[in-house]
Amino acid sequence: MKYLSYTITFVKNTHRSCQRINKSASFGMIGSLAIGFVLMIVSFWAGTYVNVRGNPVMLDFSDGASSTRGDSNAHNNLGLTGANLLHFFKNRMSDTKDLTDARGVQVSRFYDEVVRYLTAENAGASTAEGTCFPEGSIVSKLTRNVNVVPKVHSHNDYWRDLPLFEALCHGIPSVEADVWLVDNDTQLAVGHNEAFLDHAHRTLHSLYTGPLLTMLNEVNCNLGDKDHKYGVFYSSPETTLNLYIDFKSPDSTQTYALLMDLYLKPLIDMGYLTYFDMDEEKVVWNPVTVILTGDYPTDPTVLDGQEQKGYYNTTQRFVFLDAPMHKLDEHYSGISVVASASLQQLLGNCKDLSQEADRSLLRQGSLPTESVTCVAKQVQKAQSLGLKTRIWGAPTWPESSKQKLWSQQIFDIGIDFLNTDDLEEVTHL
């Protein structure tokens, strides 16, 4: 701005000089040309600062305090978060003309483009160079101005265009990843079908535990070891994220060992995982809560070691089992924080009501009152043991049936987590 001031002063002085020159008729034309030439140069130069030519505005609006922050805290936040950020990148991808060039694509063009934005080198939140600026973090970019939707689970989250990130953008605090042993049992690949696994780019580390570690490091860089850690939601840092790990491979023992030693250990070392304190017999909540589901091991010596003091012999258990809600007993209250079952499994406990429920689902797209009551009792039993509840496998088509069943699960049955594939739709309920 001082250069603009100097130039304006120069123009005024030039104008006065030219006025004096103009008093002489012989120099009148020269004076006019001089003024015009100077004004043309100033206008062209000033345009680069006031956007006359369409360039970015370069006026300085910073205050004294922020100017001392320095370039170490610069960041590339677009100012769009949540669903708006998703729509921005989807629209940007739709403008792409060349769809044949696959060079450099890893997960997908869409995913890769979003990740490049989230992890840009000038994000300013990395602690690698000693900087600490949570406002420029991935959490800030994804979830600022996003309200947490506490009663929703992102079903088959790994199938989404943006595994993990899409759920966070919608404020969903529960996700899941199906894992398979690959590469001679040295890695866990993520996917629903073993035939379509991508060992290189779709692993538990690349899609989930790696991004989570980065995000949590960025927002906790100002905290001490004993401080309670901030989570992945900007407006609700105390909210834990449920991370379901669905065991798919037959060798559950090896899957568990690899999960603990390779994928969860960095998160544990930083104090980011919820754990069960075996001495105090209580749950200590942290930013991420890992829940084992599917074909997980049930042998206590596998889960907690030979001495039954936790996998790392620290009297802490860093994973919880997804308790079977349809065949629940009290011992799950010490090893679980959630209970799940399919709708059919729960209806199977309703004596002669199962067939009637099936007919009602086909005709009316909803459960009859008797079936709702029966399922609700099983949910209440789990809740009485201190467990959150989730029902999976409910019909999702036609649309009218899905809406009715959502309403019954939330308001009539009292489920804690609604299992859904439609994240954007469910946030508007």
From Swiss-Prot:
Disulfide bonds: none annotated. GO terms for biological process: lipid metabolic process. Coiled coil: none annotated. GO terms for molecular function: phosphoric diester hydrolase activity. Keywords: Signal. The keyword ATP-binding does not apply. It comes from the Eukaryota. InterPro entries: HAT_RTT109-like, PLC-like_Pdiesterase_TIM-brl. The keyword rRNA-binding does not apply. Belongs to the AIM6 family. This is Altered inheritance of mitochondria protein 6.
